[in-house]
């Protein structure tokens, strides 16, 4: 999995950093959780030598008594599961769903072999919500926050070791107040891949890549952090960019490093006749980095240059007009712990509607991002706290610092993906921001991203019911602005199509007046649909399809609009009591399925609705680039 810096959300227990030698665990417990022959990692990108830890024993602990029973040592029975795993994938509605939504505690146990004594890294892609990690019965570290990678290191003896993780996803409202509001069900567990690897005398971390086009060539700059775990010495990385018919060597300078020191080195190379990455041609190179005999890092990257001027977004010098849908990583029976087949299904659904872009409110799993890279689907990636519409909880200095660190962790971990074209800092900000803390977060994070990742846009997403008429300081430094538009659903659902189209055009004109120098995006539009409502009436499949057609035709005709995203690709579980929200104040006698957001183009089980056909016809008539 990608290299990343230690974050404020993960805490390593200090005694472990000094040394952690295997203690004797219960032989039966270790045997029960022993790893099957290691499979290939779900994630291509990352350091060399990783072994995925896939087979675990999981035990629910609703009374939170496992610690008192000594479960930190792995002495508990349970069910064998494959990680990534969600403990509470069902139910999501009714009384049982309401209880399930409140969260619980569970314990995971596995074992692995250290082939030789030395220093090892144990890396987690994600855990929801709080994770306590124990190795051979001793505390290794803690982490808080979903969809953020974290890792711990320990000195290990050769032989078998037992890894235990306690996961706590109780109190979803408290999660929101700590900067981790969830936009769908409160799934809990080890919802991302876990791996272990031995660390050599050096370690390569946080690689970066930037492409600048020059005539028929591409000038590529690659950076990587080199950490020295050996004695004071000089370290010289090597690298290359490789395609079947082309190999480009990367020449890094040697760097003098004290023991325990880290430095960033860069290499530049001119790539003649490059195979550029774009939605129309998603060509990929393999990036190979190494300190020979000590460490390595591999990823698939795309050479592409993203630029923007005023309201225009360009890739490789060509204007981009993007169309797609928002995605929630959620599949029946799996929650947000998606299998490779689940991720393939999401990409297939996006391609079936003709999408060349996708929006995500939460950081996407690295394996899904790799699939989007390969498919040529650009990503509007949400980072930082996700709040309810118009909300902002990160007001204390501690929470504000953590909010900024969320942004940095995600941007560092996902920085090599050519599909990501924008970092979205806030979801549905009201007006000019809720308070000075939110404004300060956006401005500070924008400056950091511009300094560390200047080849991507930084954006904010406006709550369409409360847009500003005059842009305040929260927008002064961002490059793009998005706005939700539920005209025809929450707003004016009984208007004629012509009246709705006029309202949409008026909204776009207002956006352009307020933000004349920003790239403009419609981040959400849509309507709930199922078979419970009369044909053609609000809540029916026909109503949804007709409304989406109206929106898309208006947006496609506006030359100043860069992107549009249907809300949402698939129906998904929200809160168990959700029944449409404020829509019942404007549409009487609407029938919706409790617990599900039904604005999807596909049902929760994956069946295409008529709107999917309508959207596909319209999207596929638009240019891919």
Which functions belong to the PLM regions below?
Residues 16-27:
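Bacterial N-terminal signal peptides
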Residues 37-38, 59-62, 98, 103-204, ...:
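Accessory beta-strand-rich segments of carbohydrate-active enzymes
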Residues 42, 46-67, 71, 103, ...:
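Substrate-binding clefts and catalytic carboxylate motifs of secreted carbohydrate-active enzymes
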Residues 105, 158-159, 217, 258-262:
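Solvent-exposed, conformationally flexible loop/turn segments
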Residues 120, 133-135, 217-256, 263-266:
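Beta-strand-rich binding/interaction modules
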Residues 134-140, 244, 292-293, 316-317:
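Short strand-turn-strand beta-turns centered on an Asx-Gly dipeptide
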Residues 148-154, 174-184, 306-480, 484-487, ...:
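Active-site mouth of glycoside hydrolases
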Residues 160, 271-286:
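Short glycine/proline/serine/threonine-rich loop/turn segments at secondary-structure transition edges
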């Amino acid at each position: 999995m990608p290299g990343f810096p230690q974050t404020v959300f993960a805490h390593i227990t200090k005694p472990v950093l000094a040394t952690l030698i295997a203690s004797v665990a219960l032989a039966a417990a270790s045997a029960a959780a022993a790893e099957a022959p290691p499979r290939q990692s779900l994630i291509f990108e990352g350091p060399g030598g990783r072994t995925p830890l896939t087979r675990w024993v999981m035990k629910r602990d609703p009374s939170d008594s496992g610690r008192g029973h000594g479960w930190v040592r792995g002495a508990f029975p349970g069910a064998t599961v494959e990680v990534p795993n969600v403990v509470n994938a069902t139910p999501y509605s009714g009384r049982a769903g309401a209880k399930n939504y409140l969260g619980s505690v569970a314990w995971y146990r596995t074992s692995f072999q250290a082939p030789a004594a030395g220093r090892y890294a144990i890396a987690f892609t994600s855990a929801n919500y709080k994770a306590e990690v124990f190795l051979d019965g001793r505390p290794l570290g803690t982490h808080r926050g979903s969809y953020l990678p974290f890792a711990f290191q320990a000195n290990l003896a050769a032989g078998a070791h037992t890894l235990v993780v306690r996961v706590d996803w109780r109190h979803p409202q408290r999660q929101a107040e700590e900067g981790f509001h969830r936009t769908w069900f409160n799934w809990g567990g080890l919802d991302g891949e876990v791996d272990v690897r031995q660390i050599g005398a050096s370690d390569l971390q946080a690689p970066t890549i930037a492409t600048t086009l020059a005539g028929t060539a591409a000038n590529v700059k690659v950076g990587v952090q080199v950490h020295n775990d050996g004695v004071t010495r000089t370290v010289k990385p090597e690298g290359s960019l490789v395609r079947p018919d082309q190999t480009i060597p990367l020449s890094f300078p040697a760097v003098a490093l004290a023991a325990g020191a880290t430095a960033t080195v860069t290499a530049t190379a001119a790539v003649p006749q490059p195979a550029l990455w774009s939605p129309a041609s998603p060509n990929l190179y393999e990036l190979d980095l190494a300190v020979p005999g000590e460490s390595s890092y591999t990823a698939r990257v795309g050479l592409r240059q993203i630029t923007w001027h005023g309201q225009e977004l360009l890739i490789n010098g060509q204007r981009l007009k993007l169309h797609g849908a928002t995605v929630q990583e959620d599949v029946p029976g799996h929650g947000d712990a998606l299998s490779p087949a689940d991720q393939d299904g999401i990409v297939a659904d996006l391609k079936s509607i003709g999408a060349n872009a996708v929006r995500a409110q939460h950081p996407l799993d690295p394996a899904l991002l790799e699939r989007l890279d390969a498919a040529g689907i650009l990503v509007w990636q949400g980072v930082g706290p996700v709040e309810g519409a118009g909300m902002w909880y990160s007001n204390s200095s501690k929470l504000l610092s953590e909010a900024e660190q969320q942004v940095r962790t995600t941007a560092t971990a996902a920085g090599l993906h050519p599909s990501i074209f924008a970092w979205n800092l806030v979801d549905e900000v009201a007006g000019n921001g809720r308070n000075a803390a939110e404004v300060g977060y956006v401005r500070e994070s924008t400056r950091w991203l511009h300094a560390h990742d200047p080849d991507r846009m930084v954006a904010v997403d406006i709550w369409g019911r409360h847009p500003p008429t005059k842009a305040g300081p929260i927008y002064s430094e961002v490059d793009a602005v998005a706005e939700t538009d539920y005209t025809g659903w929450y707003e004016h659902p009984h208007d004629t199509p012509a009246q709705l189209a006029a309202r949409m055009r008026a909204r776009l004109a207002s956006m352009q007046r307020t933000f004349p120098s920003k790239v403009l995006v419609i981040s959400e539009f849509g309507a709930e649909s199922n078979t419970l409502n009369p044909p053609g009436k609000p809540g029916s499949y026909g109503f949804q399809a007709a409304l989406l057609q109206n929106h898309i035709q208006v947006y496609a005709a506006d030359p100043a609009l860069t992107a549009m995203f249907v809300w949402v690709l698939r129906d998904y579980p929200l809160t168990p009591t959700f029944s449409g929200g404020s829509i019942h104040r404007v549409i009487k006698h609407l029938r919706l399925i409790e617990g599900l957001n039904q604005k999807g183009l596909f049902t929760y089980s994956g069946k295409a609705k008529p709107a999917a056909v309508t959207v596909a016809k319209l999207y596929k008539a638009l240019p891919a680039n």
